[in-house]
Amino acid sequence: DVEPEGPVFSNASTLNADENQTAIGTVSATDPNGSVVTYSISGTDASLISLDTSSGVLTFNSAPDYETKNSYEATITAIGSIANTEQVLIINVNNLNDNIPTFPSSAIFTGDENQTAIGTVVATDADGDTLTYSITGTDLSITSSGVLTFVSEPDYENTTSYSATVSVTDGLTSLDQAITVNVNNLNDNAPVITSNATFSRVEGCVGIADCWDFGTVAATDADGNPMTFSVVTPDPPITGYDFEINATSGKISLRFSADYETKNTYTGTVTVVDSAEDGSK
């Protein structure tokens, strides 16, 4: 006995179809007996695909999304006059550039003063396309890969914040994001003593309270840091330092009642220190 021959498929077993549209393609088979072939569909994803039983035209019931489902499988049966033939059909969805890049990263950045580094702007693209970055403005710079820098080293005491607009493109679509870069204030300025280096008072300090009111060393710190005052070089030493200073206020006093006829000039060095720098006068 000779087994009956079924229809022979002429189409490939793998088809490709673009996302966002329903068209797939056509299956085609011929019957060796010359009869008209009809078609049916079954299998894993048959419920998602429509098949014209006469023409073999395949369509998605709804347009596919590559990012959701990018491959479908079904079994096509070609029905002949004597026998049938099955073909497992794979339909691969083509990924189109149909998604605009997005900015999941924060629009707020920080960078230390006195250096150019800031950080990296990060955008994503659901299509997996290569992204390219650009920026508007003159104070900030960005590489095509998103590395963000200051054009020149910032000084917190001059400018504390910068703004710009970053653009990202996937080659077809683009998106803008306004960003802000806040400058971190570092302790990069030494205190400056602003008061005169000479103080005077009437001899004969009566009681320690009057002695404390001899004068005050004034200083400023551009970084706004707390300052601490100290006496470092008494000259000449008389039972300890000739004078002392309040570490917080900078108020100075002799350590004893002054007598003009005994000594009328006292010299020493006062240092004012913040946490990292110092200045003296």
PLM features per residue range, with description:
Residues D1-V8, S13-T102, I108-T116, V121-V192, ...:
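Acidic, turn/loop-rich segments in luminal/extracellular domains of secretory-pathway
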